Amino acid sequence: MHFDWSDFIWTLINFFVLLFILKILLYKPVLKTIEDRKKSIEESLEKAAKAQEEAERIKAEYDGMIAKAREEAREIIAKAQKTAQAEKEEIIATAQREAQSLLADAKATIAQEKEKALRELRQEIGNLAVLAAGKILNRAVTLEDHQKLVDEFLNEVKM
């Protein structure tokens, strides 16, 4: 076996030339592509993190708005219930006042009707008494006698 130094040197030169060409043509562009890809991924991750933070901020803002809206709804409902209760109480009070007024009017009307009926009854009793007295006395009673007897009878009845 014979070792040829010239082949060895040419092989070595070819190897380094190939290595140099590969470094220029492949290694640097591949390295640059990898570096660009790495930067792109990092930028995408940063954008995603910012988007995540923004989404969380917006979600917190919306949660706050929803909580505020719910609280406002509770307040509106409570106010409406309070107003309805006040209106109910006012309606009941008005109805009670009207009922009491109607009852008082009815009592007054009944009292007036009773008084009127009593007056008419007294008058009728007086007339009947005069007629009875006239029959007993067997004489005609004049209008003046009639009025006098009615007045006397009514005075006695009142006592």
Swiss-Prot record:
Pfam families (UniProt xref): ATP-synt_B
Name recorded for this polypeptide: ATP synthase subunit b
Chain's role: F(1)F(0) ATP synthase produces ATP from ADP in the presence of a proton or sodium gradient. F-type ATPases consist of two structural domains, F(1) containing the extramembraneous catalytic core and F(0) containing the membrane proton channel, linked together by a central stalk and a peripheral stalk. During catalysis, ATP synthesis in the catalytic domain of F(1) is coupled via a rotary mechanism of the central stalk subunits to proton translocation.
Keywords linked to the UniProt accession: ATP synthesis, Cell membrane, CF(0), Hydrogen ion transport, Ion transport, Membrane, Transmembrane, Transmembrane helix, Transport
Family: Belongs to the ATPase B chain family.
Gene3D superfamilies associated with the record: 6.10.250.1580
Residue intervals passing through the bilayer: 7-27
MF annotations from Gene Ontology: proton-transporting ATP synthase activity, rotational mechanism; proton-transporting ATPase activity, rotational mechanism
Location in or out of the cell: Cell membrane
